[in-house]
Amino acid sequence: MAKPELEFFDPIVVASMPWVPVPGYPEGIHEKILAIDPPTGPWRHKTRFLRFQPGVETKETFVHDYWEEVYLIEGILIDVGKNQTFKAGMYCCRPPGMKHGPYKIPFGAMAYEVHYYLK
């Protein structure tokens, strides 16, 4: 199975979708899922907005078995492990196994993310 087929829809619909706490993440991190392929599990084949409240810090280094693309819409993410700061307008494409984080988000941030597997 794949993600559902979705034609363009009104941004008011997206704006009215709830921000939901991300299971397993620290408090202050919320997601708005646009599309998901449920059989692949909660972390895979997903398109979402991710919002970080000011002052959020993650504790772990992240490594996963799927591809992840991230476009930072607003704010700043500080990758403590790499000692790098990422700003709004920056983009990354992470292959499976790429380490990233932990993060500090001093002023809040929002990102657009796509998670997927390639065979």
For each feature predicted by the language model, list its residue ranges:
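Glycine-centered positions in the ABC transporter ATPase nucleotide-binding domain
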Residues: 74-75
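A short, N-terminal "cap"/entry segment at the start of jelly-roll beta-barrel domains
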Residues: 1-44
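Alpha/beta-hydrolase fold active-site loops
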Residues: 67
